[in-house]
Regions:
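Short, Lys/Arg-rich, polar N-terminal cytosolic tail immediately upstream
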Residues: 1-9
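Transmembrane signal-anchor helices characteristic of membrane glycosylation enzymes that use polyprenol
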Residues: 8-34, 123-125
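Extracytoplasmic catalytic/substrate-binding loops of multi-pass membrane glycan-assembly enzymes
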Residues: 29-42, 48-54, 59-71, 81-82
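Short acidic/glycine- and proline-prone juxtamembrane loop motifs at membrane-interface regions
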Residues: 32, 132-137
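Loop-to-helix entry region of an early transmembrane alpha helix in multi-pass inner-membrane enzymes
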Residues: 58, 62, 66-70, 78-97, ...
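Hydrophobic transmembrane alpha-helices
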Residues: 72, 76-77, 99-107, 125
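Transmembrane-helix motifs of polytopic, lipid-linked glycan transferases
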Residues: 86-114
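Transmembrane and membrane-interface helices of multi-pass
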Residues: 96-98, 114-126, 131
Length: 139
């Protein structure tokens, strides 16, 4: 059992896929934080008017993280009105990559601890909320 887990946890790609699968059921709940709709509207206005603003072409920013607005605008350009699920999957994967980097710092020599840390960290309720409900915290 230990050798199987070591093989799985030593492969970063498989570990990130596992964390993405853990978060996948949350996408079917369609539970989105209401603040994310503000950011997504600002991103839509950036795509439509070239302005980071809430009310059309008016230059009043309503976003807290401009990087997330730019990423959301990119996803809206690529996927159109169906951008939400790919954006949330991307956010969850970025969070998993970040937790993997943190695990490599905390547990540089122990692959099992590193793997369990990444999987368990990505299962915590605040982590699920941060990376699967539309807010920029996953990024």
């Amino acid at each position: 059992m230990k050798s199987v887990l070591s093989k799985i946890f030593s492969n970063s790609f498989i570990l990130i896929i596992i964390t993405a699968i853990i978060k996948l059921p949350l996408l079917f709940t369609k539970n989105i934080q209401e603040d994310s709709f503000i950011t997504w509207r600002v991103a839509r206005n950036l795509v439509n008017y070239g302005v980071i603003g809430f009310n059309g072409d008016e230059r009043i920013s309503a976003s807290t993280t401009h990087l997330y607005v730019l990423i959301t605008a990119f996803f809206q350009l690529v996927f159109g009105e169906y951008f939400i699920v790919p954006l949330l999957v991307f956010s969850g994967i970025l969070f998993a990559v970040g937790s993997l980097w943190l695990a490599k710092i905390l547990f540089p020599d122990d692959i099992l601890k590193r793997g369990f840390f990444v999987v368990l960290l990505n299962m915590l309720p605040p982590t699920l909320t941060a990376s699967a409900l539309g807010m920029e915290y996953g990024i």
